Structures are given as structure tokens and as C-alpha cells.
Swiss-Prot record:
Organism: Homo sapiens (Human)
InterPro entries: ZF_C4H2, Znf-C4H2
Listed PROSITE patterns: ZF_C4H2
Annotated keywords: Cell membrane, Coiled coil, Cytoplasm, Developmental protein, Differentiation, Disease variant, Intellectual disability, Membrane, Metal-binding, Nucleus, Postsynaptic cell membrane, Synapse, Zinc, Zinc-finger
Annotated GO CC locations: cytoplasm; neuronal cell body; nucleus; postsynaptic membrane; protein-containing complex
One Pfam family in the UniProt entry: zf-C4H2
UniProt record, GO biological process: nervous system development; neuromuscular junction development; noradrenergic neuron development; positive regulation of DNA-binding transcription factor activity; positive regulation of neuron differentiation; protein monoubiquitination; regulation of transcription regulatory region DNA binding; spinal cord motor neuron differentiation
Organism ancestry: Eukaryota, Metazoa, Chordata, Craniata, Vertebrata
Function: Plays a role in interneurons differentiation. Involved in neuronal development and in neuromuscular junction formation.
Effect after changing V63L: In WRWF; causes a decrease in synapse number and density
The protein, known as: Zinc finger C4H2 domain-containing protein
Disease: Wieacker-Wolf syndrome: A severe X-linked recessive neurodevelopmental disorder affecting the central and peripheral nervous systems. It is characterized by onset of muscle weakness in utero (fetal akinesia). Affected boys are born with severe contractures, known as arthrogryposis, and have delayed motor development, facial and bulbar weakness, characteristic dysmorphic facial features, and skeletal abnormalities, such as hip dislocation, scoliosis, and pes equinovarus. Those that survive infancy show intellectual disability. Carrier females may have mild features of the disorder.
Length: 224
């Protein structure tokens, strides 16, 4: 009787070992699948970060182009102001010469009339460009400044976004790896090829339906 009881205990132990072993194998298989999914997601995250870096570099390149353009505009504005100052000085000098020439010509014309000679032609009669009115007209054209066109909203927004991303990136590098805030996972829209959130059902730019690059696997039923 004792032997039978011992045999039954051993059989129960063997059954329990078998059930626990099967349960362990199932958990091991699930664990292996989870690790594979983890490694795959890490690779995708690395790709997303690389793509984000490329986009950031592209935006910063546009910001640098805008900075250089504004620097050139400032240099040209200073050059134009200097040229206008030089033109104003020349105009004042021309006006003084006109003022000196006019009474002298009137005196010469009066002397010529006493001798029965015709008066000399005026400067404007000889050449239009020697007229004081011509120089005044030119001055008005010189002082007309070209209107600077406004920066397109999309380009201005891109420049502002690039600067914000650069500041956020510098702040992020000062944090430890444990508490580092990760950017949201992104993917390329199949229609417009713009970067959108990985889980976005519809592209916010072109309104096309989005399909996830890595669709979620259906959950397995928990083992009883």
C-alpha cells in the first residue's frame, strides 16, 4: 500500500514537471519573440532618428541660407546708403555750380546784347542732363527704396521649427541616457513621402490613408 502511494506521488510529480516544463517552453518562446520584436523596434527607432537628423540638417541648411541672404541684404543696404550719400553730395555740388553759372551767364548775355549779339543758349537747351530739374528728378528715383518681399510662411515656419529642434537637441544631449526623452516614432507617407507619426491612420498633409510599416501582431491568448 505504501509502495502504491509512493508510485502515485511520483507520477503526480512527473505530471507536474511535464506541465511546468511545457509552460516554461511556451514562456521561453514568447520571450524569444518579444526579444526579436524588441530588436526590430530598436532598428526602426535608429532609422527614425537617422531620418530625423537628416531632416534637421536640411532645415538648418535652409536657416543658414536665410542667414546668409539677410547678411547680404544688410551689406547691400549699407552700400546703397553710402551711394545715396555720395549722390547727394554730388547733387549739392551740382546745385552750387548751377548757382554760380546762372548769374555769370546773365551778365555775359547782357554784355552780348549791348554789342548786338545773341544770348548764349541755356544749359537745358544745350543738353537736358545739365538741367537742375533733371538732377532733382534723378534724386527722387535714387531715394526710392525697393520693398523687401515678405518671407513665405512655410519657409519662416521651417526656419523657426529648425531652430527649436536644434535647441531641444542640445538640451537633450545634456540629460542622462536613462531619462532622455525620445522623439516619437515616424514613418514616410506612401503618397506624399512626408514624415508622419507611425501610428497616424491618416496623413495630416495629403489626407491619404496611412498603413503602418510594422503592424501590430494579434495578441495571443494567455495560457491557462
Amino acid at each position: 500500500m505504501a509502495d502504491e502511494q509512493e508510485i502515485m506521488c511520483k507520477l503526480e510529480s512527473i505530471k507536474e514537471i511535464r506541465n511546468k516544463t511545457l509552460q516554461m517552453e511556451k514562456i521561453k518562446a514568447r520571450l524569444k519573440a518579444e526579444f526579436e520584436a524588441l530588436e526590430s523596434e530598436e532598428r526602426h527607432l535608429k532609422e527614425y532618428k537617422q531620418e530625423m537628423d537628416l531632416l534637421l540638417q536640411e532645415k538648418m541648411a535652409h536657416v543658414e541660407e536665410l542667414r546668409l541672404i539677410h547678411a547680404d541684404i544688410n551689406v547691400m543696404e549699407n552700400t546703397i546708403k553710402q551711394s545715396e550719400n555720395d549722390l547727394n553730395k554730388l547733387l549739392e555740388s551740382t546745385r552750387r555750380l548751377h548757382d554760380e553759372y546762372k548769374p555769370l551767364k546773365e551778365h555775359v548775355d547782357a554784355l552780348r546784347m549791348t554789342l548786338g549779339l545773341q544770348r548764349l543758349p541755356d544749359l537745358c537747351e544745350e543738353e537736358e542732363k545739365l538741367s537742375l530739374d533733371y538732377f532733382e528728378k534723378q534724386k527722387a528715383e535714387w531715394q526710392t527704396e525697393p520693398q523687401e518681399p515678405p518671407i513665405p510662411e512655410s519657409l519662416a515656419a521651417a526656419a523657426a521649427a529648425a531652430q527649436q529642434l536644434q535647441v531641444a537637441r542640445k538640451q537633450d544631449t545634456r540629460q542622462t541616457a536613462t531619462f532622455r526623452q525620445q522623439p516619437p516614432p515616424m514613418k514616410a507617407c506612401l503618397s506624399c513621402h512626408q514624415q508622419i507619426h507611425r501610428n497616424a491612420p491618416i496623413c495630416p498633409l495629403c489626407k491619404a490613408k496611412s498603413r503602418s510599416r510594422n503592424p501590430k501582431k494579434p495578441k495571443r491568448k494567455q495560457d491557462e
